[in-house]
From Swiss-Prot:
This is tRNA-specific 2-thiouridylase MnmA. The keyword Hydrolase does not apply. One of its GO terms (biological process) is tRNA wobble position uridine thiolation. It comes from Rhodopseudomonas palustris (strain BisB18). The record marks 138, 352 as: Interaction with tRNA. The lineage of its organism: Bacteria, Pseudomonadati, Pseudomonadota, Alphaproteobacteria, Hyphomicrobiales. SUPFAM superfamilies: Adenine nucleotide alpha hydrolases-like. The gene is mnmA. Its main location: cytoplasm.
Length: 400
């Protein structure tokens, strides 16, 4: 007989490790599972030097968060452990974040953290503790398939859905993970937290990248990759120099204000060229991209990726965490994979994720995804656009 987590055995005989960040979502997850009788163990990861982030609203994984997680564990009566993952986090997430920015990409550190820290290292720790599953407070769901494996699906609350950040989850990891909040709304979660008497019931949501509590990611990039702060030229699509800048890291795709150049028509940042330290600007229509070349593709759909793609697979993709999935085609191309967007997208950026879905709305199944290597217009009007990687938008919402 299966319990509420779709696992064999009675809840009291089933150990569940909960990843507790100190926020209301993971805290409610732990309290909910404890109330259902599970043998719950809470684990909080210390990921970075958190002193500067203490007590700051909108920052996660900070010193105050560790205190809050411990207080919740004491309240609901579960063991709680803090694991020092600072060196792993520095190498796997922070260093790669800075390196990605220095090459003109816009990384999504939450994806890398989930992939290499939470769902690899922490999951291994949970298994070592004899847990039957690792539960998190993500707003996403999973369901059992006919063969016993699990599918990743969007949360019922589309405005809270975090599936974009979890596309890199492997099949093996997905079978071990559980997401108890997948069918809840945020207000319902907070109401449960109040019911359980949790001190974090009204705690602010995390909004910044956790290791950038000030919101100024350029401080991190500048410290680790000073070359990203070197001055360069601002040029138009024909290569004409329009002005100077003080580092490509200060610019984002679609940016119009603060360019420091005069023009009779509106100009937008189109892309960054780190090798020449150039910022390329142009008209708004030049922002639209239609073809995306992917790297590091992860497939969690049925069968193998190559068999599923065949001569072309019609699906839906999301190239920003805040956008709804849009129609696209996934094709094999030159030993890799390429996505063709039916309607196109403004500001597609290398380093961001392109996530695959089987439907445009509702609790769609996540089929996988990849990181964007480059993007081009379907029919570039300027030779300067052909084959050139697109530039980057604002850092994606880091909640997750």
């Amino acid at each position: 007989m299966l319990n509420s987590l779709d696992l064999e055995g009675r809840p009291q005989d089933t150990r569940i490790v909960v990843a507790m960040s100190g926020g209301v979502d993971s805290s409610t997850t732990a309290a909910l599972l404890k109330s259902e009788g599970y043998d719950v163990v809470g684990i909080t990861l210390q990921l970075y030097d958190h002193g500067a982030a203490i007590h700051r609203k909108g920052a996660c994984c900070a010193g105050q968060d560790i205190h809050d997680a411990r207080a919740v564990a004491d309240r609901i009566g579960i063991p709680h452990y803090v694991l020092d993952y600072e060196s792993r986090f520095q190498e796997s997430v922070i260093d790669s974040f800075a390196a990605s920015y220095a090459t003109g990409e816009t990384p999504v550190p939450c994806i890398e953290c989930n992939r290499s820290i939470k769902f690899r290292d922490l999951l291994s720790t949970a298994r070592e503790l004899g847990a039957s599953a690792l539960a998190t407070g993500h707003y996403v769901s999973s369901r059992r398939l006919a063969d016993g494996s699990r599918a990743l699906v969007c949360a019922s609350d589309a405005d809270r859905d975090q599936s974009y950040f979890l596309f890199a989850t492997t099949r093996d990891q997905l079978d071990y993970l559980r997401f108890p909040l997948g069918d809840m709304t945020k207000p319902q979660t907070r109401e449960l937290a109040r019911k359980f008497g949790l001190s974090v019931a009204d705690k602010h949501d995390s909004q910044d990248i956790c290791f950038v509590p000030t919101g100024r990611y350029t401080d991190v990039v500048g410290r680790l990759k000073p070359n990203a702060m070197e001055p360069g030229e601002i040029v138009d699509l024909d290569g004409r120099v329009l002005g100077k800048h003080q580092g490509i890291v200060h610019f984002t795709v679609g940016q119009r204000r603060g360019l420091g150049i005069a023009s009779t028509a509106p100009l937008y940042v189109l892309r960054l060229e780190p090798s020449t330290r150039r910022v390329v600007v142009g008209p708004r229509e030049a922002l639209r991209m239609d073809r995306i070349v992917l790297r590091d593709v992860n497939w969690i759909g049925d069968s193998s990726l190559d068999r599923a793609v065949g001569d072309g697979l019609e699906l839906f993709v999301r190239v920003r965490s805040t956008r709804r999935p849009q129609p696209a085609w996934l094709r094999a191309q030159d030993g890799g994979y390429q996505v063709e967007l039916v309607a196109g997208e403004d500001g597609v950026s290398p380093g961001q994720a392109c996530v695959f879905y089987d439907a445009p709305a509702g609790q769609a199944r996540v089929l996988g995804g990849g990181f964007i290597k480059s993007a081009t217009p379907r029919a570039a009007g300027k030779s300067a656009l052909r084959g050139a990687p697109a530039s980057r938008p604002q850092v994606a919402d880091a909640r997750g």
